[in-house]
């Protein structure tokens, strides 16, 4: 009986020692002053309107991934997504930022949009996971000039300004059809100036109009001429939102 108990105690003690040694080994794998991070990347590129399909921005393989420290890319820590390490990455202790992006970072563009995600994380002799979701930094603007505009005006356009554009601007002319992707902050108020030339060549600018725009939002501006009371009606609609706006712009009565 004593031999049996002794054997059981030896097995239990041996198992405990094995467990303890395994745990110690795991801890010893993290060198002093260092830690590990595992990276994960997602995308959320769909505008709430679902009006168009930006498929290429959903493909993770198009993205560049970086780890930054103090605003600078850590040496050897930049990859295209297919080459991004799937195992844990060793880093010295400190504060870092995971950044992933695709596209050209421009204040406004008709050709493309810029999609980016950032996430800060800290290494403190431990193992962490840093996950980032990439989203467009821009809102989308579409202008729809009613066909009757040509009955009253030789030329017409809208000039937009945003914080990112600074002293510059971008215009939507009467023949434009492609949406403009504008880099904006959340609930930024963008400004619009309406430029009109009537059939007699008289010019007018209607400015000081502002509209709210956020990343992933789609602003649709409908411009319709009204042939009474010398007014042009401007209907502003935000897709999939109940916050529609109606704005009337008064111009001289002899224009119509």
Predicted segment positions?
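Extracytoplasmic cysteine-anchoring/structural motifs
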Residues: 21-256
